[in-house]
A protein has these predicted regions:
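Cleft-lining beta-strand/loop regions that shape enzyme active-site pockets
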Residues: 786-793, 807, 812-906
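PDZ/PDZ-like domain segments forming the peptide/carboxylate-binding groove
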Residues: 757-816, 890
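Blade-terminus and WD-like Trp-Asp/Gly-His loop motifs, strongest in beta-propeller folds
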Residues: 32-35, 69-77, 125-133, 169-177, ...
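Beta-strand-rich domains and repeat architectures in extracellular enzymes and scaffolds
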Residues: 22-49, 316-335, 592-609, 613
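A short helix->beta-strand "capping" segment at the edge of beta-propeller domains
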Residues: 22-28, 54-56, 301-317, 577-594
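A flexible loop/linker signature enriched in serine peptidases of the S9 family
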Residues: 22, 41-47, 61-66, 79-91, ...
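Terminal targeting/pro-maturation regions of precursor/exported proteins
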Residues: 666-739, 743, 785
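Extended, small/polar residue-biased N-terminal targeting/export presequences
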Residues: 720-775, 842-850, 854-862, 866
């Protein structure tokens, strides 16, 4: 069986950082200008620099991200998107700096981080030409698409621009027209996209209430900037994203910039000046000359999120393995390998490699050395270190792909490992010679383990029917044999330590569950625990035995029991596995346990241990009964050891091998596992491993025709300039975007985030009356039986009506604030007192208590679907039904069932 506990895979550590000039500033994001100054985001904070370049000065300092600054038309105020109070909201500050003013109070969006594919919520887009209002994009009513809103610069209730959806935008000089995008794809890691969501630039006329597509191009045409009679925008119609210009008089489009290495990113304009990102630098361009000029910027920063720090290794454990004597553990945590005592002693970090990802450490069964995987060379290789310490020995060299995992032979002489090329390799520890035993065209050999005599391997491989088949491999013959057939999916095989059985899980229990909506079925919990009797001479442990035993036989049994127990230990140490393949598929017996999902097997021939039904269990083959060993805990056993390692929650426990329910006792002390995290080295490693992950795992070897080595070189030069994890994620996202592949995302990792403070929502549309109180314009109808699909104002007994006024919240008159939602900050799901009145006054108001919603998207979506059902029903005279399926996951299936069956009368 696997002799380690695998908790999760963590991609960590790094390659040496590239050198950089001390005063050079790069990865400068989201620039804006007033013509004289440029404000940009660097490491999540806003900085200001003269438009001619020079030393930048920090304007903000906060754990959250400040981004998308936009100067007011008079150049005196900066509007920006920030996370000061937890939510991503719109703020303003004087151009000279100072305390930010919060302008909006909207809903907490669970998907509004900078690295999310939908982008941040409440992105500041522009100002109205008169400088009175700020335009921003909000996703309060739609988790994916956004709508454009305006808000007064001093704050207040926002007003929607009458467009169904919107993104980046820019007003015409007279303010009567708006050039805008409908879609927001700027944060997706998918370049060169030409599908149905490829954006165009549209012009909306507020006077005529018309829209016009001015690009109508299959490529991405985004971020319009209206200057005089020209609209500048980005397009990747020539592959690399560059600036183009459309003349509103001649209707002609021309290319302006001609960058070929890096895309032009996130331009903005003010007056006649355009500023933009390219390759992490900021450029400016006069709209008249149309000649870009790099702005040389220097800055100094404490780089607080890139500084080294000490982390508790116990929070990052990915694997643990018990020494054969049961006295020490080797634990992998955050890419480091620790050797620590089970009870008392010294905890040692035996790798100390912040620039490498070390993992899967295991003790050798003889207890003399430790083997682990590391990518210190830039490729994953196997390493060995003496258990008492000393130099690391590299066991494999010049590996060409990712090593998935490995297993040591019980005699400690060999290591079997698998890789991303679906090879199963055998390493001779003494000679370091590697032999490829097989390469599977369908997928990797899974769960490879040795027989107790080190002469056989067992594993599963995927058959042509997509079912997994159990195999054994004879190392002397260099030949594999199937042990199960194609008719049932089987997994997780291990040899019993006495060499008599092969224990595995198999899906052979067919107990369908039938649906309530139609005569259909689904199969769950199909797996059971099975034994293959390897030798013809091995009887089934479930043969019925005669209960009548003579006194003489019973006495003889007592006299020989001690000898049998003594000789059993010797047999286990020298168990020779004998396999008769003739009729082997007919020598399969099932343990009488409830069907479920099983794995992590261990058997000494008398008992079978396994994970299943929420914990570790044991089946006694002699007593023929099952006992719970440890609920919620998984178990790992070393060959020949009397000790076992349990993992439960975040704790590790070591006990004797239990015969029944285990007493876990006190957990192992993990508090001395301290890791010195060097973020620059760690981030360099993460970048490199991300690149290798696509090199080794992309579905096409030609990488969509991309020179993947050149792509790495192109973006690797940016990595030393990363000062936050979000910077690194952006670089990796740009790199994988070159593959022009959908659903290729970056796991955000450890991102510094402020605590979210959820704003309570009412499931209603409101306006501000001239009295200063807030009027209920519309209460969204919903499903009365669902709390998430109804407005709290529709709760029976509250009887709120459209046209009524909310005159106070928790005792605070609403006419005393600019935005009523400022009184609902932190009130999501919290009982809240509101005063309702048919008149805009406190006198005569009635008191009621509601629990505001956390989000309104579900309610808006529900109303949208209901409206569409009514429209289709009316247009077809009741003959056609309407179903909206949001995705192909559980929610999509639920929505189909929810709306399909009730409309079978259509």
């Amino acid at each position: 069986m696997k002799k380690k506990l695998i908790f999760s895979l963590l991609v960590l550590a790094g390659v040496p950082s590239l050198s950089m000039a001390v005063d050079e500033a790069r990865l400068l994001r989201f620039p804006a200008t007033n013509g004289n100054e440029i404000v940009f985001s660097y490491a999540g904070d806003l900085y200001k620099v003269p438009a001619t370049g020079g030393e930048a000065r920090r304007l903000t300092s906060h754990v959250g991200y400040e981004m998308f600054p936009r100067f007011s038309p008079d150049g005196k105020t900066i509007a920006f998107t920030g996370q000061y109070d937890g939510n991503t909201e719109v703020y303003t500050m004087p151009v000279t700096g100072g305390e930010p003013l919060r302008v909006t109070y909207t809903a907490t969006n669970s998907r509004d981080d900078l690295g999310d594919r939908m982008g941040p919520n409440n992105i500041v887009m522009t100002w109205t030409p008169d400088g009175s209002r700020i335009v921003y994009r909000n996703r309060i009513s739609d988790g994916f698409s956004g709508k454009l809103f305006t808000v007064e610069k001093e704050g207040g209730l926002s007003e929607a621009i009458p467009l169904p959806e919107g993104g980046f935008c820019s007003y015409s000089p007279d303010g009567k027209q708006l050039a805008y995008n409908r879609v927001m794809r700027e944060f997706r890691t998918w370049k060169y996209y030409k599908g149905g969501m490829a954006d165009d630039v549209w012009i909306y006329s507020s006077d005529k209430k018309t829209v016009e597509n001015i690009t109508d191009n299959p490529a991405q045409d985004i971020i319009p900037m209206w200057i005089g009679d020209e609209i500048f925008f980005l397009s990747d119609r020539d592959r690399t994203m560059n600036i183009f210009v459309y003349n509103t008089k001649t209707k002609q489009t021309d290319k302006v910039t001609d960058f070929t290495e890096y895309d032009v990113k996130f331009p903005s304009a003010n007056g006649n000046t355009i500023v933009f990102e390219n390759g992490g630098y900021i450029y400016k361009m006069d709209a008249g000359s149309k000649k870009p000029e790099k702005v040389n910027i220097t800055l100094t920063s404490d780089n607080i999120y890139a500084r080294s720090e000490i982390k508790d290794g116990a929070d990052y454990i990915t694997e643990a393995c018990l020494s054969p004597d049961g006295e020490r553990l080797v634990v992998t945590a955050r890419g480091e390998v620790f050797n620590l005592p089970v009870e008392k002693g010294v905890t040692k970090n035996i790798t100390r490699s912040p620039g490498a990802h070390d993992r899967n450490a295991q003790w050798s069964p003889d207890g003399k050395f430790i083997v682990y995987i590391s990518d210190a060379t830039g490729e994953t290789e196997l390493y060995m270190q003496d258990a008492i310490g000393g130099e690391h020995v590299q066991l494999t060299k010049d590996n060409d792909t990712y090593i998935r995992g490995f297993e040591l032979s019980p005699d400690s002489k060999a290591v079997v490992y698998t890789d991303r090329k679906n090879r199963m390799n055998l390493l001779d520890v003494a000679t370091k010679q590697v032999t490829t035993l097989l390469q599977d065209p369908m997928g990797e050999p899974r769960g490879v383990t040795f027989s107790p005599d080190s002469k056989w391997l067992t594993y599963t491989r995927t058959g042509n029917n997509e079912y997994s088949i159990v195999y054994v491999y004879n190392l002397a013959e260099k030949k594999e044999y199937p042990v199960t057939d194609k008719w049932y999916d089987s997994s997780s095989p291990v040899f019993s330590t006495d060499g008599k059985y092969l224990v595995f899980a198999s899906a052979r229990d067919f107990n369908p569950t039938y649906g309530s909506l139609e005569w259909n079925h689904v199969y769950n919990n199909m797996y059971g625990v099975y034994l293959t009797l390897l030798s013809k001479d091995t009887p089934s442990p479930f043969i019925e035995k005669d209960a009548e035993v003579s006194v003489a036989k019973e006495e003889s049994k007592k006299n020989t029991s001690v000898k049998k127990e003594e000789t059993r230990k010797e047999e286990l140490a020298t168990s020779v596995v004998k396999i008769d393949f003739d009729g082997i598929t007919d020598r399969v017996v099932k343990l009488p346990v409830s069907p479920s999902y099983y794995g992590n097997f261990y058997s000494d021939g008398n008992k079978v241990y396994y994970w299943g039904r929420g914990g570790t269990r044991v089946f006694d083959l002699k007593e023929q009964k099952e006992d719970v060993v440890a609920d919620g805990a998984s178990m790992g056993v070393e060959p020949g050891s009397k000790k076992v390692l349990f993992f439960k929650g975040d704790a590790l426990y070591v006990t004797d091998i239990p015969s029944g329910k285990a007493d876990l006792g006190d957990p192992v002390n993990l508090s001395n596992m301290k890791i010195a995290v060097d973020y620059p080295k760690e981030w360099a490693q993460i970048f490199d491993e991300a690149w290798r992950a696509y090199r080794d795992g992309f579905y096409l070897e030609n990488m969509h025709g991309v020179d993947w080595n050149a792509v790495k070189a192109k973006y690797q030069v940016l990595v030393p300039y990363a000062k936050t994890r979000l910077d690194l994620n952006y670089i990796i996202g740009e790199m994988i975007g070159e593959l022009n592949c959908g659903h290729a995302y970056v796991n955000p990792g450890e991102v510094e985030r402020p605590d979210r403070i959820k704003t309570g929502l009412l499931g209603a549309e409101i306006s501000r009356d001239k009295s200063g109180f807030f009027r209920l314009e519309k209460i969204l109808p919903g499903a009365s039986w669902s709390k998430s699909l109804r407005s709290p104002l529709t709760e029976p007994g509250i009887e709120a009506k459209a046209g009524e006024f909310i005159v106070a919240i928790d005792g605070v008159p609403t006419n005393s604030v600019k935005d009523m939602y400022s009184l609902l900050v932190g009130k999501a799901g919290v009982p809240t007192e509101i005063l309702l009145n048919s008149k805009p006054q406190l006198e005569g108001a009635r008191k009621t208590v509601i629990s505001p919603l956390e989000e309104e998207y579900s309610l808006y979506h529900y109303n949208w679907v209901q409206d569409n059902i009514k429209k289709v029903d009316k247009a077809s005279n009741g003959k056609i039904g309407y179903i909206y399926i949001p995705d192909m996951g559980p929610e999509g299936l639920n929505e189909f069932s929810r709306y399909f069956y009730p409309q079978l009368d259509k």
